Amino acid sequence: MTKKIGIILGSTRQGRISPAIAEWVTAGVAKHPELSAEMLDLGAINLPLFNEPTIPSVAPGVSEAAIAWREKVTSLDAFIILTAEYNAGYPAPLKNALDYLKTEWANRPIFTISYGFSGGASAAHQLSEVLIRIGTVQIEPNIAILIGDKLNANGGIDDPHASLAIHDEELDIALNAIEAWAPTEEPTDV
């Protein structure tokens, strides 16, 4: 049975490089016949700031946005989160997307790819704390992409496959772990 991976683009700003990184990730997933990928671009999904009447650990969100996001997340088996690092943290839209749900994240494998001038280390660390709290299964090793030497004059990545090839083995290890992962009977709330 094919496992469906949601690739979450955590940055929504114009000029972001996550679409180029997602292109490289999608090509890596395509090399694994037991996996398929679906892009979850938070910029396109455009979740409003979390403002549900209750918190997700008490009751599911009731807004159209919350229901659609919950249905999308629960339709997938695993996730790869692409996170930029802004001011030593991960982007607010990513935190917002995580906060909309609680038990839906539990026991789901999540692999993080961070990027920034320091590889996104601070963002990855902060994100890891949240992922632990919501009960995900974190797939290691995370990938930290140093972007300084990969950016063109416009701040983009011209050829993500060539620029990110140094991380191909790490991506393959993570994808193998997702392939091998077996879910528990029922998600647990943490």
Describe the predicted segments one by one.
Residues 2-33:
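N-terminal beta1-alpha1 ligand-phosphate binding loop
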Residues 35-45:
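A short beta-strand-loop structural module common to alpha/beta enzyme folds
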Residues 43-60, 151-156:
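N-terminal beta-loop-helix "entrance" segment that forms/cooperates
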Residues 59-135:
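Helix-loop-strand module that forms the ligand-binding subsite of alpha/beta enzymes
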Residues 137-190:
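Glycine-rich phosphate/pyrophosphate-binding loop and the adjoining helix
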